[in-house]
From Swiss-Prot:
Phylogenetic classification of the source organism: Bacteria, Bacillati, Bacillota, Clostridia, Eubacteriales
Pfam family, any one: DUF3362
Native organism: Clostridium botulinum (strain ATCC 19397 / Type A)
Keyword presence, 4Fe-4S: yes
Comment on bound cofactor: Binds 1 [4Fe-4S] cluster. The cluster is coordinated with 3 cysteines and an exchangeable S-adenosyl-L-methionine.
NCBIfam families according to UniProt: SAM_YgiQ
SUPFAM superfamilies associated with the record: Radical SAM enzymes
Name this polypeptide is given: UPF0313 protein CLB_0243
Sequence segments annotated as region (Disordered): 598-645
List of residues binding [4Fe-4S] cluster: C309, C313, C316
Keywords per UniProt: 4Fe-4S, Iron, Iron-sulfur, Metal-binding, S-adenosyl-L-methionine
């Protein structure tokens, strides 16, 4: 364990630090991991740097009010988050089945946090300390700050500020706003008077004094009229910029949810300061007996080089959380962290990742953003690269080269998503070549998501021909460097716009790939994304065009089965789908057929016979030659959800 002290979690810790009353208490749905990949750790350490005392209540028993009283009543208030992932996404699959594991909990076991954790925790805190201010933040609060469609309820819910009775919501990355809010509280301002901090959302009864704002359709309108919902989302989508974004107001009965414009992005110096704070860089020792916290394994020897993403994938809500503007750390800051890792006793020579939401977006998309902000009606890389886009991997490549030269570093991997279209726009192949030569371990994971151009257009992804060109170039480079490395594509079924015809088109593409992909995921309608708005309304809010939505559970199962057509258990669904789509030409023994005429006999196999677990039956399928790909790529669905680019 680290020599750095963890933040206090008990009265005994308070005594050791001679603290009578904490300034703030963070209540979180994750186990306590003091690592900069965890929001609780960052906010706690930032407040500590500002001279505040901070305690942590991690995963309290929501059925026991005493758990919320264990550190006493804080001087300034409680800070509440659900953890690194929305609690509903953490608990349920895309088909609404309960998950049985939780990589952010002791021993990887589920059951340590409630559904809708932010709401539950806030209600319990109000019960324990009626007049104590509550500030909510993190992904769950950020993406639910307005009235929003909730997939699990299949209805439009109010702003989480209304349901939680919290006093203030900090959205996005919270370092700047939490410092401003905490200092205002220290200076004596009441929580209900803090209304002018950027990056915050609050509830107001009277907006007559508010200036320069846009009022979006009310909760009552968006919960009963899908066109109004799409209109509200479009305005929200366009105004999430710190330079040109306006204050947004949404009425909820007799009150108003008010979102101040976003905070300016952190400067490089500010980013360096945040990641240089004294983190223990591991989980609290209280979890050791339970097997630790599995989530630390992915991040312990990974380096966050930047935040933000201008890829604007429709199914990703990052625009609403980290924003489109890249905020990067200096090379010196990153190299210091890499050197520090090599001195950790369990470092084996491998740095698992140097990246961010999209690894090869290391700098701002263009110079225009610095003065005017992000473009309101245009995207940086979709449908094609903007003429102002700066396409350059030189700085990122120089950083990777420097890390490779650090003593005791054997290998530096890139596991964050690589945006392959941006890679293809670069006329200089130097980065692409060194990526293949030094930074992948036998396979590169990329996210084409689909190959039907009509679906890709709705996803905000590049066209199929861009991906095909990338695939060819990838294998050409591997041939030149005498390596036989694979590509592992992330694929998605049932996204808005995907009908059976599109799913079959994707299945035919998979057939030509020669193996059955493991990285397949049903579209998951999570709060805050453009695709979720399409899913709920049947409308593309940016174009106002109608969109086909595969909501029927049988069809969704068919679409997923088509993506793994060679698995024995999927035979009946695939056959039914092909017949329904009048594609009987794909049933038979021909080279282009997906399945044979008759369902093959399923042989019994021993449970430990890993070679035959999937029961692949297609003689024309080359999957078995590449079975090592799928075996190496079995990851939990939460990590898949996070890393799709």
């Amino acid at each position: 364990m680290s020599n750095i002290d963890f933040l206090p979690i008990s009265k005994e810790d308070l005594k050791k630090r001679n603290i009578d009353v904490l300034d703030f208490i963070i209540v979180t749905g994750d186990a306590y991991v003091d690592h900069p990949s965890f929001g609780t750790a960052i906010i706690g350490r930032v407040l500590e740097r500002e001279g505040f005392t901070v305690g942590i209540i991690a995963q309290p028993n929501w059925n026991n009010i005493e758990d919320f009283k264990k550190l006493g009543k804080p001087k300034y208030g409680f800070l509440v988050n659900s953890g690194n992932i929305d609690s509903m996404v953490n608990h349920y699959t895309a088909s609404k089945k309960k998950r049985h594991d939780d990589f952010y909990s002791p021993g990887g076991k589920s059951g340590y946090r409630p559904d809708r954790a932010v709401i539950v925790y806030c209600n319990k805190i109000k019960e324990a300390f009626k007049d104590s201010p509550i500030i909510i933040g993190g992904i769950e609060a950020s993406l639910r700050r307005f009235a929003h469609y909730d997939y699990w309820d299949n209805s439009v819910r109010r702003s989480i500020l209304e349901d939680s009775s919290a006093d203030l919501l900090i959205y996005g990355m919270g370092e700047k706003p939490i410092v401003q809010v905490s200092n205002l509280l220290r200076y004596g301002m009441k929580i209900d008077s803090i209304k002018n901090v950027r990056g915050t959302t609050y509830i107001e009864k009277d907006i007559s004094s508010l200036k320069d704002y846009i009022e979006i359709p009310s909760f009552e309108e968006v919960s009963t009229n899908k066109k109004s919902y799409a209109e509200a989302y479009k305005i929200q989508y366009y105004e999430q910029d710190s330079i040109r974004g306006k204050t947004l107001v949404q009425k909820h009965k007799e009150r108003y949810v008010v979102q101040n414009p976003p905070q300016p992005p952190l400067s490089q110096e500010e980013m360096d300061e945040v990641y240089a704070l004294p983190y223990a860089r591991t989980y609290h020792p209280m979890y050791e007996a339970e097997g630790g916290i599995p989530a630390i394994k992915e991040v312990k020897f990974s380096i966050t080089s930047h935040r933000g993403c201008y890829g604007s994938c429709s199914f990703c809500a990052l625009t609403f959380h980290q924003g489109r503007v890249i905020q990067n750390r200096s090379q010196d800051s990153i190299l210091k962290e890499a050197n520090m890792m090599t001195n950790m006793k369990d470092f084996k020579g491998y740095i698992h990742d140097v990246g961010g939401p999209t690894a090869n977006f290391r700098h701002r998309a263009c110079k225009v953003q610095e003065k005017h902000g992000t473009c309101k009606n245009k995207q940086c890389v979709f449908p094609k690269a903007c003429k102002n886009l700066i396409v350059d991997h030189k700085e990122y490549l120089s950083l990777l080269r420097k890390i490779r030269k650090i003593p005791n570093v054997k290998k530096v991997f890139i596991r964050s998503g690589i945006r392959f279209d941006y890679l293809m726009y670069d006329k200089n192949d130097e980065f692409f070549k060194e990526l293949c030569e030094h930074h992948i371990s036998g396979q590169l994971k990329v996210a084409p998501e689909h190959i039907s151009d009509k679906v890709l257009n709705l996803m905000g992804k590049p066209t199929r021909n861009v991906y095909d060109s990338f695939v060819k170039k990838y294998y050409d480079i591997n041939k030149k460097i005498h390596k036989n490395q694979f590509l592992v594509p992330y694929l998605m079924s049932s996204h808005p716009g995907s009908d059976l015809k599109a799913a079959i088109e994707l299945a035919q593409y998979i057939k030509k790939m020669g193996y059955t992909p493991e990285q397949v995921q049903d579209f998951y309608p999570t709060p805050g994304s453009l695709s979720t708005t399409m899913y709920y309304t049947g409308i593309n809010p940016l174009t106002e065009e109608k969109v086909y939505i595969p909501k029927d559970q049988k069809e969704k199962r068919m679409q997923r089965a088509l993506l793994q057509f060679s698995i024995h258990d999927n035979y009946d669904l695939v056959k039914e789908a092909l017949i329904k789509a009048h594609r009987e030409d794909l049933i038979g023994n021909g080279p282009d057929c997906l399945i044979p005429y008759n369902k093959p006999y399923k042989k019994s196999h021993k449970k430990n016979n890993a070679k035959n677990n999937n029961n692949h039956y297609n003689k024309n399928n080359n999957y078995n030659k590449n079975k090592d790909i799928s075996k190496k790529n079995k990851k939990n669905s939460l990590s898949k959800h996070k890393k799709r680019k």
